[in-house]
């Protein structure tokens, strides 16, 4: 398999690189323990009730308040690794996760933390999110398809991570040794990052996972089993049919492809997938085992014909995904995998030859939250907002009107929600995501806001972010006050102009 990423593609990059360019980092409180006086970047927050909340972030920082955010104490986490996620099951029990397989557990309300061992310890994968389902049950997600479950308070963890099978699209790209592992039934983990897991506050048996490449999952048993969700773009095109041994497309097909490309031109999170097909007769006559190159040339020509129309319509090549491309170097695999060519031919077989053109969902997703068992929201890179009305089975896009990365969201209902993100983004909607705006009670900031969470009941909540920024609301998010830092003219200066689009 490809070399592991030292920091998972984009998520960790946004957590690590962006803050470094904006300020000097300090990791220890001035004067030792006690009230915070220095700015650790904060990535996540968990709110137990109107009094108790915990925030976590850079260099092993875990901060705790038990007076509704008036004062905060830096607790002993026993690590200097970055902590990306934190979740409390109740006032006493919770977990925090982070860099290099870090899993911490508390049983005293976050005052002290103990390291827990998982099956990922020797793999060094980054853990990006944790959801405490109960004092004994929790779910963790991270890079390389990491999906862990404990039902005994973290004494043991079940590894339910995403793996590759022989019919998985990534199988053909594995190294030969990894392919052999798959055939033997050994686990080879999928090269995908899962960024967030969350469960419904009122019933934590209903949970959801999201990640890169539009990976979506839902569970109705507290994370013991998962089912895939899907994004419905509403943009489709009929397959481009071609005759036997033909590569040219008709004027009508050209117009249809052009209209299809124009429909997604401004939606940068959508790519176009091109997948050529061949008939049984073509495979038999042109794809002979001792010389499959004539068939490869037909397949390649069909792909190029359609791709040229898409590019002429204004779609850059980096947004075009070529699936089922001819394996020109197939001879390198035959000795170790005698069925390689047969599998490829079977994957191209269709009744009517031609090319399938489809939407390839490619949003990089950061956070998922549900207001109830049906109404859910997802945020992502480039201002992506997704909505579900059926418990996460299907999702559709909503228009935020901004292009910043949206790191967090809190829904109060199916109509009302608040999102936070980079460059001080704090927006709200009261019409189910049809329109978004900066409400009158929102502060004007220029720092990165990472996470948002509210206490059960929804009145008291916090936003956390860069340089130990902590905002507090007591009125369901309508108005916010700065809890930490007490003053910072760089971060709190009023904007002279609207924030950059």
What kind of region is each of these model predictions?
Residues 11-19:
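Bacterial N-terminal signal peptides
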Residues 232-268, 276-297, 351:
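Short, solvent-exposed beta-strand/turn patches at coil↔beta or beta↔helix junctions
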Residues 79, 253, 295-303, 402:
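Short, conserved glycine- and acidic-residue-centered signature motifs
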Residues 2-11:
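Bacterial N-terminal signal peptides that target proteins for export
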């Amino acid at each position: 398999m490809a070399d592991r990423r030292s920091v998972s593609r984009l998520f960790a990059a946004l957590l690590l690189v962006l803050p470094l360019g904006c300020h000097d980092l300090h990791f220890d409180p001035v004067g030792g323990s006690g009230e915070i006086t220095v700015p650790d970047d904060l990535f996540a927050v968990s709110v137990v009730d109107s009094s108790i909340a915990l925030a976590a972030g850079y260099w092993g920082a875990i901060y705790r308040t038990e007076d509704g955010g008036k004062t905060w104490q830096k607790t002993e986490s026993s690590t200097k690794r970055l902590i990306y996620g934190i979740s409390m099951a109740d006032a006493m029990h919770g977990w925090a996760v982070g860099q290099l397989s870090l899993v911490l557990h508390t049983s005293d309300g976050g005052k002290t933390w103990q390291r827990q061992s998982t099956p990922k310890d020797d793999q060094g994968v980054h853990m990006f999110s944790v959801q405490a389902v109960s004092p004994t049950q929790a779910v963790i997600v991270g890079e390389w398809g990491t999906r862990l479950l404990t039902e005994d308070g973290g004494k043991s963890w079940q590894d339910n991570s995403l793996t590759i099978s022989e019919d998985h699209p990534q199988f053909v790209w594995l190294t030969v040794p990894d392919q052999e592992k798959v055939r033997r039934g050994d686990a080879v983990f999928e090269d995908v990052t899962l960024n967030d897991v969350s469960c419904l506050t009122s019933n934590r048996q209903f949970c959801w996972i999201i990640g890169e490449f539009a990976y979506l999952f839902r569970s109705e048993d507290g994370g013991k089993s998962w089912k895939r969700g899907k994004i419905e773009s509403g943009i489709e095109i009929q397959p481009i049919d071609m005759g036997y041994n033909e590569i040219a497309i008709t004027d009508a097909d050209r117009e249809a492809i052009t209209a299809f490309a124009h429909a997604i031109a401004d939606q940068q999170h959508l790519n176009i997938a091109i997948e050529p097909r061949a008939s049984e007769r073509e495979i038999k006559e042109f794809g002979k085992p001792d010389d499959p190159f004539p068939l490869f040339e037909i397949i390649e020509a069909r792909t190029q014909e359609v791709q040229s129309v898409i590019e002429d319509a204004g779609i850059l090549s980096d947004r075009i995904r070529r699936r089922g491309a001819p394996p020109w170097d197939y001879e390198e695999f035959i000795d170790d995998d005698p069925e390689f060519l047969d599998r490829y031919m079977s994957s191209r077989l269709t009744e009517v030859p031609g090319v399938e053109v489809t939407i390839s969902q490619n949003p990089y997703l950061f956070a998922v939250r549900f207001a109830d068992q049906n109404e859910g929201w997802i945020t992502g890179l480039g201002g992506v907002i997704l909505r579900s009305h059926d418990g996460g089975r299907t999702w559709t896009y909503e228009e935020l009107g901004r292009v910043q990365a949206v790191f967090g969201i809190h829904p109060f209902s199916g109509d009302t929600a608040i999102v936070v993100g980079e460059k001080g983004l704090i927006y709200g909607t009261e019409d189910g995501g049809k329109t978004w705006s900066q409400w009158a009670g929102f502060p004007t900031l220029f720092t990165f806001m990472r996470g948002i969470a509210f206490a059960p009941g929804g009145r008291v909540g916090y936003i956390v972010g860069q340089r130990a920024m902590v905002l507090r609301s007591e009125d369901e998010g309508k108005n916010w006050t700065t809890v930490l830092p007490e003053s910072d003219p760089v971060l709190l200066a009023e904007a002279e102009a609207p924030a950059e689009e």
